Amino acid sequence: MSAPKLALCVEDSGYEIAFAGRSNAGKSSAINALTNQKQLARASKKPGRTQMINFFSLGNPDQRLVDLPGYGYAAVPEDMKRVWQKELENYLIHRKSLQGLVLLMDIRHPLQHFDMMMLEWAYSRHLFVHILLTKADKLNRGPANKVLLEVKQQLKKMKLDFSIQLFSSLNKLGLEELASVMAGRLHFTLEQQPEFDVDAIPEASDEDAEE
């Protein structure tokens, strides 16, 4: 199910883990890799079509993955940005079934302003957070591990005890680790197929695909 605003979301019950990140962090690609559904989030040249809250039931309707609108909203009017940001804030603040975040950051540009805001907000709400440094295939192993260590050190300075890993949806780096995290929170395995209507899913922006 997809909803443009909090008031139209599925019933606020059960347990939800939301995927959040900038519009170019590879969020849709990560969800596709995790659920083994190549067309779950489809590419579009119209960024506005992805700015909805998308719910995916994992067999049990009370356990859901949630695909949140990417923040950053490049190349869209300012008034549209404000509307999207307001609805995203409403979900993050008021959604009682939201229990955790998977926060995606491009490994080449980690800990941007909005990322820091999301981390601080999640901490204030006592949510668990698992961070994916996406597009790790863009760096060699040494530089990628260096960024991972630097981000871990920054989180430690902020006194944020959040888990973090390298991830690439292109070569499936870190996929099993991510699935293990999901299994610890939801009844999820890589072989499990989520229940959803593909045709009901709004198309994703080009910026949300792996570059």
Curated annotation (Swiss-Prot):
Q: Which residues does GTP bind?
A: 21-28, 48-52, 67-70, 134-137, 167-169
Task: Tell me the domain of life.
Answer: Bacteria
Cofactor(s) recorded in Swiss-Prot or TrEMBL? Mg(2+)
Q: Give the stretches traversing the membrane.
A: none
Q: Name one GO biological process term.
A: division septum assembly
Q: Where is the EngB-type G domain?
A: 13-188
Question: Which Cys pairs does UniProt list as disulfide-bonded?
Answer: none
List the molecular function annotations (GO) for this entry: GTP binding; metal ion binding
Which GO cellular component term is one of those annotated? Answer: cytosol
Does the record's keyword annotation contain Calcium? no
Entry binding sites for Mg(2+): S28, T50
Q: Write down the InterPro entries for this protein, in alphabetical order.
A: G_ENGB_dom, GTP-bd, GTP-bd_ribosome_bio_YsxC, P-loop_NTPase
What keywords is this UniProt entry annotated with?
A: Cell cycle, Cell division, GTP-binding, Magnesium, Metal-binding, Nucleotide-binding, Septation
Q: What is the similarity comment for this entry?
A: Belongs to the TRAFAC class TrmE-Era-EngA-EngB-Septin-like GTPase superfamily. EngB GTPase family.
- What does it do? Necessary for normal cell division and for the maintenance of normal septation.
> This chain belongs to which protein, by name?
Probable GTP-binding protein EngB
Q: Which organism is it from?
A: Acinetobacter baumannii (strain ATCC 17978 / DSM 105126 / CIP 53.77 / LMG 1025 / NCDC KC755 / 5377)
